[in-house]
């Protein structure tokens, strides 16, 4: 990894006496697909050698779980191996104890006028992302832009991002298992008189936990428009995070699970470990990672794709859209390019 980032030009950034926010997802306890702390420690050590003052950071979550406040979040991070000793730097929850410590960054975007970004990330001099590249049930995949836009948003910011992404229930698929009811943090789901899950949209915040938990494809995202709008907003939040800051991005195309690391479980990887990629351009990086996964062979390990019909013909097909047909990840990259975050054109250089 160190050889890769040096080849990609990270040493061109002046790190001396600069606070560097290393934005990483600590993983929900129980999930085993997140980036291991060994990589974070190596990056922190490199940054220190360049004169930086690095810290690992993430913002609190909107949904129920063990990362919705700073106390539980830090305990979860430690449980997954992230602490000042193992990571070689401090661990800071960027939006504070209850997710209320944020700054509004005025960008006057088409969808978001003043994104709410975790204060510690705003106060940092430099932003460096370490991204686990994988599928995502609401955005198609999660990579650099997802880690920036959604990951750096405060709890209130996440509410704004999810405001157009409410799920629906395919009633014919519901098995009355009650798992979505038990795990909804906002008491927005109940079983109706027919024992079918029903969503109260006055309470639903669109976090997507029910979509991730449902084993029967009963809870699904509404339509392609909601995924597109969410990806547009994520791009604009990413712009707010990176505004006037030197930045660098590293994506781990390893343990490519079908869904995000926010849940306390993970499905089997869909493709072999494909390596690590790095760039100054988060848009080009996401596009390159997507293409690499799309063109990779599927693992024959009883995963989401290998269990699907005609799986032997999926090499070169859009694996993310096959897993999450209601999503449109391309829309997010196109909008990010439109607002000047980067370009989808790239050159792959193997190190």
Where are these regions (language model features)?
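Extended, low-polarity segments enriched in aliphatic/aromatic residues
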Residues: 1-24, 29-39, 45, 50-58, ...
């Amino acid at each position: 990894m160190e050889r890769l980032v040096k080849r990609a030009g990270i040493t061109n950034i002046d790190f001396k006496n600069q606070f560097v926010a290393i934005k990483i997802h600590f993983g929900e306890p129980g999930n085993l697909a997140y980036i291991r702390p060994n990589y974070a420690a190596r990056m922190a050590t490199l940054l220190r050698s360049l004169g930086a003052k690095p810290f690992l950071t993430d913002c609190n979550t909107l949904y129920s779980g063990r990362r919705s406040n700073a106390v539980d979040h830090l305990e979860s991070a430690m449980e997954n191996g992230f602490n000042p000793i193992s990571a070689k730097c401090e661990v800071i929850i960027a939006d504070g104890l209850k997710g209320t410590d944020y700054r509004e960054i005025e960008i006057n975007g088409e969808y978001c006028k003043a994104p709410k970004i975790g204060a510690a990330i705003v106060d940092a001099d430099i932003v460096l992302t370490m991204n686990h590249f994988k599928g995502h049930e609401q955005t198609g995949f999660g990579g650099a832009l997802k880690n920036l836009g959604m990951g750096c948003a405060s709890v209130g910011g996440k509410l704004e991002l999810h405001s157009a992404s409410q799920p629906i229930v395919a009633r014919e698929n519901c098995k009355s298992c009650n798992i979505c009811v038990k795990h909804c943090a906002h008491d927005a789901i109940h079983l109706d008189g027919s024992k079918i899950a029903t969503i109260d949209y006055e309470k639903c915040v669109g976090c997507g936990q029910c979509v991730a938990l449902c084993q029967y494809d009963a809870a699904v995202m509404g339509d392609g428009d909601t995924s597109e709008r969410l990806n547009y907003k994520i791009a604009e939040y990413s712009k707010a995070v990176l505004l006037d800051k030197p930045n660098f991005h590293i994506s781990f195309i390893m343990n490519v699970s079908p869904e995000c690391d926010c849940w306390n479980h993970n499905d089997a990887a869909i493709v072999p470990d494909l390596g690590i990629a790095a760039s100054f351009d988060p848009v080009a990086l996401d596009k390159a990672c997507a293409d690499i996964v799309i063109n990779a062979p599927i693992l024959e390990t009883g995963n989401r794709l290998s269990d699907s019909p005609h799986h032997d013909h999926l090499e070169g097909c859009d694996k993310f859209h096959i897993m999450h047909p209601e999503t449109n990840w391309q829309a997010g990259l196109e909008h990010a390019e439109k607002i000047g975050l980067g370009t989808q054109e790239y050159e792959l250089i193997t190190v």
